[in-house]
Amino acid sequence: MAYIEGNTGKWEYIIGLEIHAQISSKSKLFSGSSTIFAANPNSQVSYVDAAMPGMLPVLNKHCVYQAIKTGLGLKAKINKYSVFDRKNYFYADLPQGYQISQFYYPIVQNGTMEIPTSTGDLKTIRINRLHLEQDAGKSMHDQSPHYSFIDLNRAGIGLMEIVTEPDISSPDEAAEFVKKLRNLLRYIGSCDGDMEKGSMRCDANISVRRSGEPLGTRCEIKNINSIRNIIKAIEFEAKRQVDLLENGEAIIQETRLFNADSGETKTMRLKEEALDYRYFPDPDLLPLVISDELINELKANLPELPDQKIEKYTKEFGLSKYDAEVIVADESVAEYFEKAANECNPKMLTNWLTSELFGQLNKASIGINECKITPSNFAKLVKLIENDTISGKIAKTVFEIMFETGKAPDKIVEEKGLVQVSDNNVLNTVIDEVIAENPESVEGYKRGKDKLFGFFVGQVMKKTGGKANPTLVNQLLKDKLDS
């Protein structure tokens, strides 16, 4: 467990998260308006989104399905009966004067997610609920020195709010939870998880206490927009609370904003209670009733999820848990890996994938979907190494050409004359030449200077243009020098 070091001793982090995940859907939660990112202001607004009198919401079935699939991925209970409520508050970018949400009867409850801890163990984080709600619009204050403007393109977009219990005990655990949740949502296809575009936002509820004491007063940090900022915001806020408590001051329950530039949290408003929002069932929407048949159908059509893939890669492919997690962390990489792994040695493939390919992708600042090397050609390269057609050193040269051109490795090897020399007679001839040309080094080796062995290997490789089979060279050289 991580602690905050105060002037009077150690304090514990108590953290709960609320994740707002924008549902991957072409239309909004209660209207047919488009959800395309970065469209011209107010170009994707229906009469329902603008709250024109007499306009009634119509529930988007696809958004409901996405929420159910996400709940199944979280190993949660899917409630067969749920209700939409009105959350009443006034803000300029909320034209209805209320937000349609689910307070009393959410669609999903009681889920779990396991995350790795600093000790290497797995820790279970309980999911209190997942509920559906609509997003608000956006206030724009930088268009004019005299006026603020409202863009309602986001108003009515479907969100899944995923709320954890206060089971998180450090900033790093919070970051791990968000990363793992984001990956799960991407695999399911219910949210793209792009925090830079605002399609996934995190609120953190933070309090501190001494070990064994009751829970303290919490503060909520709103709209944290990156994994790095989650860590920084929690660290700052926890330290702020510890400083206040150690100076004999009380923590005020409030909502705060994190400033990424200063690394500090600032008061936004006093924290509201549920009573302040006057929740009541929305009279324009019927209760949502979900059948067992629908739940079973959606469950049967779920893709293979990250934890399932990790288990498969370790058991079927023999990968280490660490390597499996690295590959599964990106769905596109996992898909690429599986296509190639069906044609070659998975372990050797993993080594080349995580070192050479990842290195070149990072250098070129591109994703694996933009890579010119097909999974099939990558597998061919691994097989050429595996069957001793080329050495690992030559393979790196071949790989670089493949990355630039997309050519098949066997064609490159043929064109460049890079086939590994594994003929004993040819290699013995070269070795005899090297020994004859270096009598002093031979004498030195025979007197016990074992490090000279590497010199002889290097000379043989030099004479063969790096194409000699290194394993065979070592064996033949040793036989001759030790005789």
Swiss-Prot record:
SMART domains: GatB_Yqey
InterPro entries the record matches: Asn/Gln-tRNA_amidoTrfase_suB/E, Asn/Gln-tRNA_Trfase_suB/E_cat, Asn/Gln_amidotransferase, Asn/Gln_tRNA_amidoTrase-B-like, GatB, GatB_C_1, GatB_Yqey_C_2, Gln-tRNA_amidoTrfase_suB_CS
GO molecular function, one term: ATP binding
First-tier enzyme category under EC: ligase
Catalytic activity: L-glutamyl-tRNA(Gln) + L-glutamine + ATP + H2O = L-glutaminyl-tRNA(Gln) + L-glutamate + ADP + phosphate + H(+); L-aspartyl-tRNA(Asn) + L-glutamine + ATP + H2O = L-asparaginyl-tRNA(Asn) + L-glutamate + ADP + phosphate + 2 H(+)
Alphabetic keyword roster: ATP-binding, Ligase, Nucleotide-binding, Protein biosynthesis
PROSITE patterns (UniProt xref): GATB
Assembly: Heterotrimer of A, B and C subunits.
Protein name, as recorded: Aspartyl/glutamyl-tRNA(Asn/Gln) amidotransferase subunit B
Organism listed in the record: Rickettsia felis (strain ATCC VR-1525 / URRWXCal2)
Gene: gatB
